[in-house]
Amino acid sequence: MERWDYEPSNEWDEVEELEDLEDLLPVLGHRNWIQIADMAFPSLNSPGVQTILVDDEILPVLDFVLELLNEQPHIRPNVWLDAELDFIREDWAQGITQFRRELYERLRGLPVNKLPHEQLIAKLSEVSKQFQVVVIKTRTCLPYTSVFLELDCAYWDEQRERMLRNSMER
């Protein structure tokens, strides 16, 4: 099974507020989520949600989290983005064009999915009823810039799961 391909940005630096995340990652597994949120993302009150406030922007936090995930032998991220992000014009939100460019550079080599923002929030709310969700709230003030990381098993994939299920049906 191939390891997901992540090339850290040169902006990567340790995020002090996320030291606890390093200890938490070995406990997390497939079906858990990590969200790196913009400042206006609402506080979720589901019991399965843990929120961490960091004094940094989304992109350096993303670098740090992806680097930590890359060190884990058991999990890999599936990335989810707000579908709205691709449609925001620079004159509506200054800095969004550069943010998008830098974000997509960082995500090169990772599976990226998109859904409308409200659907992603609903997905997180549903998941948090049974599984741990870690929300890392940043100081980024650009709309629809949250990055949602759905954790998946790093040593098993959908194709192998289908083959397993097919052989069990025989």
Placement of each model-derived feature along the sequence:
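Long, hydrophobic N-terminal alpha-helical segment
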Residues: E2-I58
